[in-house]
A protein has these predicted regions:
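Active-site catalytic pocket residues across diverse enzymes, especially alpha/beta-hydrolases
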Residues: 87, 111, 115, 143-144
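Histidine-anchored nucleotide/phosphate-binding helix
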Residues: 31-37, 134-143
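Acidic, Mg2+-coordinating phosphoryl-transfer loop and its flanking beta/alpha structural elements
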Residues: 142-151
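Short phosphate-binding/catalytic loops that engage adenosine nucleotides
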Residues: 43, 145, 176
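Active-site acidic carboxylates
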Residues: 1-95, 116-117, 150, 159, ...
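Conserved N-terminal glycine/acidic-rich loop preference
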Residues: 96-135, 157-179
Length: 179
């Protein structure tokens, strides 16, 4: 069985763009190191990309969060910093999932495809802990009842550290590993 690392939305707009925040920038090297280690150890890696179109403000999410961001194929949509190298690399153990909102209903199917079935273990990291990380963690936890699902707490961030911590407590209470 495969092990899976999911890097959630580590994109320019969440680090130094429209919705950027200081804590996100500090994650660049630690996330890069985790991705490199995972690939070297034979893990599968999925990068999610928040992906919107020009009509974002007319969507339900755009009404809730009226800040245009991660418009497909703009600079803000691409992975941030050193992680951007993976967008131009071809690797059989890696894939991208473009998602139109906080959580991706396609993520479990993508994980099965990449892993050749249900992953044995899943780790998540990225941003924003209390929005997209938690949404995708719950989708994966619900889809893979035999998989351990863990959040890499030091490789996730939210603009408000209290939101980050309260989300980790919530996930811990639902049986997720917080490592």
């Amino acid at each position: 069985m495969s092990k899976l690392l999911v890097v959630v939305d580590y994109q320019n707009d969440f680090v130094n763009g429209a919705l950027g925040f200081e804590q996100a920038a500090a994650l660049e090297d630690p996330i890069l190191n985790r991705v490199q280690t995972a690939l070297n150890d034979g893990w599968k890696v999925i990068f999610t990309r928040d992906t919107h179109s020009e009509d974002y403000l007319n969507t339900r999410e755009g009404q809730f969060l009226p800040v245009p961001h991660c418009i497909e194929n703009t600079s803000g949509w691409h992975l941030y910093g050193k992680l951007a190298q993976y967008e131009s690399e071809s690797c059989p153990n890696m894939m991208f999932v473009n998602k139109p909102t906080f959580g991706s209903e396609e993520l479990p199917h993508a994980a099965c495809t990449l892993c050749g079935g249900e992953p044995e273990a899943i780790e998540l990291c990225g941003v924003v802990t209390n929005i997209c990380v938690v949404s995708n963690a719950i989708l994966l936890h619900s889809a893979f009842l035999s998989s351990s699902v863990s959040i890499l707490k030091d490789l996730c961030a939210a603009p408000n550290p209290e939101d980050h911590e309260s989300t980790l407590r919530l996930l811990s209470g639902m049986g997720y590993g917080i490592v």
